[in-house]
Amino acid sequence: MRIFRYLEDSRTYLGVLLEDGTAYRLNAPDLMTLVGEARKAGASTADYVQSLLSELVSIHAAPESLALLTPVDAPEVWAAGVTYQKSREARNYEATAGKLDASTFYDKVYDAERPELFMKSTSARTVGPGEQVGLRSDSTWQVPEAELGLVLDRTGAIIGYTAGNDMSCRDIEGENPLYLPQAKIWRNSCSIGPYVRLAETLADPYDLTISCRIYRDGVKVVDESGSTGQLKRRLEELAGFLKRDNELFDGTVLLTGTCLVPPNQFTLASGDRIEIEIASIGTLVNTAAYAHELEQA
């Protein structure tokens, strides 16, 4: 069972997509309100929605044809780093200028008890399906990072799963680790969507194929895939560290790291179409653009 948000006649609605492909408009204004209603009814969110189906209005169009928004208006998006061997290798390549001739702090954090966690985005900087993701004007090595996102409540409990794009500047991050915020956070540097798969309806979050495809002028230039089965850490472990002595907000999203990285010689260009697909969740599609192009959009 997947939850989505969409815009129709200047109004925002919440919808649900069932396994048989049928979709319905929900009466709750947003995901976290829906979760709260289910808890008051003493039911899981999925069971609560199931009990409402006979009262709901059907959506006859395919959700992908609607004006989809971020499935949850996340007040904050956090991210975990170096949680996959592939990510570790990519960070080491950047930190050693491609020489791979020394152990780095990325090796240490990969094996450390404490994971790398950092602030990635805010609601205003996060975009949804079909929107443009931003490119920095001062970077020459930019890539998308396809990641499984955890949708959390204020206690750190996992409400559901979404697809996320952690846009990154490999040259800025590799130049100096203290530049990480600049390598990760700027206008439209994060996208999530198109759905939130309710946690209770996903059998095994460690058995999801993640794919990233990039098209330039209609030609596929990147096609990479990996699996959450390669994740070094447990999802609850990452959420647990995030909530430790921290205030979480309902609808916070935690991106859990990337298991795939485009080839080292690749960098995004304006107009590139990015498709991030996670099995059982959906395909998040965005187009890359520079800031001055975003202002014209």
Give residue spans per PLM region:
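Short, acidic/polar N-cap/turn motifs at the starts of alpha helices
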Residues: 1-3, 12-13, 147, 209-211, ...
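A generic structural motif
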Residues: 30, 165, 227-228
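Glycine-centered flexibility motif
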Residues: 7, 12-15, 42, 130, ...
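Short acidic-glycine loop/turn motifs at beta-strand connectors
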Residues: 7-10, 17-22, 152-156, 215-219, ...
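Active-site microenvironments in enzyme catalytic cores
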Residues: 47-216
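Catalytic-pocket segment enriched in acidic/His residues
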Residues: 9, 170-297
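Generic N-terminal segment detector
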Residues: 1-86, 95, 103, 237, ...
